[in-house]
Amino acid sequence: DKKPKSFLATDSYRSGMLNALRTNFRQISNVLQEGIDANGGYLVPDEYDSRLIQVLNEENVMRSLGTAVTTSGEHKINIAATKPAAAWIEEGGALTFGDATFDQIILDAHKLHVAVKVTEELLYDNAFNLENYILEQFGKALANAEEDAFINGNGTGQPLGILAETGGAQVGVTTKSSGKVTADEIIDLVYSLKRPYRKNAVFLANDACVAELRKLKDSTGQYLWQPSLQAGEPDRVLGYKVYTSAYFPLPAPGKAAVAFGDFSYYNIGDRGSRSIAELKELFAGNGMVGFVAKERVDGKLVLPEAVKLLKMASA
């Protein structure tokens, strides 16, 4: 037997949502009443949510590198705080066991709201693909806000970013100069990361910093940078892929300039479905109609030792 569809996956709910968008939520069909969100607005149809997630993954480098989980409530992750140890014993000798201890990481739900504006002419033009436009705009706005928080967030009312002083990535190398990174320091950064994490490790930095990395040469005069040989594939440094983010801070004295590690240990918790609501009368005076998308999300680096930072020396 086929599993019955969730009401969010039905064609009638999706068409009801499109009609509501086109009428600025002045016409609400009965089927849409099922999707009223407790925080205001209407839960987006499954197809919309899938397309939003696709845009989020394309636009947000941290989502493409991290691990996303869908949660219905507070999500707890148990992390082994102590590792098992092996010991040689004499024949017939007594076995000794240490007590395993666990730390607990909790993914909560922080509310993120983004708004987009549409002209009334486009809203009522049936030839205009309103769905695609709104989902693309919402997706990009949500992705930008998420990426910023997943990198720089302080954990208060927002996710905890990889650069957080507490709970973020660990400092692997501090540069000798406050304004310059050397090839040797990048090599040291790679080997500051424990071997198991190096297998899936990548670099992450601001574009301006990556421009400097491209110029670095080793002791034999060879560039560390290795251009990609395949379209769509990232370039590499020392054999490791390089990703950029506009939200990774520019190199500055006393601040992190480059992150290197296995970012799959950055866990992203999506709480439930996203919702859409109208912004009543906010733009009424200039012929614009506003919509707001809401989501609840959290993010944390569950193993800080999985990502290492190259930190600039203080001035």
Question: Where do the language-model regions lie?
Answer:
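Assembly-associated, polar helix/coil segments characteristic of icosahedral protein shells
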Residues: D1-I105
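Residue-level recognition of alpha-helix termini/interfacial anchor residues
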Residues: N24, R296, L303-E305
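Extended oligomerization regions of viral-like shell subunits
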Residues: E47-S50, T70-K76, N154-E295, K308-A315
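Intrinsically disordered or highly flexible coil/loop and linker segments, enriched in small
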Residues: V61, K83-A86, E147-I151, G155, ...
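Short helix/loop capping segments that flank catalytic or ligand/cofactor-binding pockets
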Residues: I79, A85-I89, G98, D125-A127, ...
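Beta-strand elements of well-folded, non-transmembrane domains
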Residues: A81, E120, E295-G299
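Alpha-helical scaffold segments that mediate packing/assembly in large oligomeric complexes
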Residues: A94-Y191, K308-A315
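Glycine-rich loops and low-complexity Gly/Arg-rich segments
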Residues: A100-Q104, K140-A143, P227-A231, N267-G269, ...
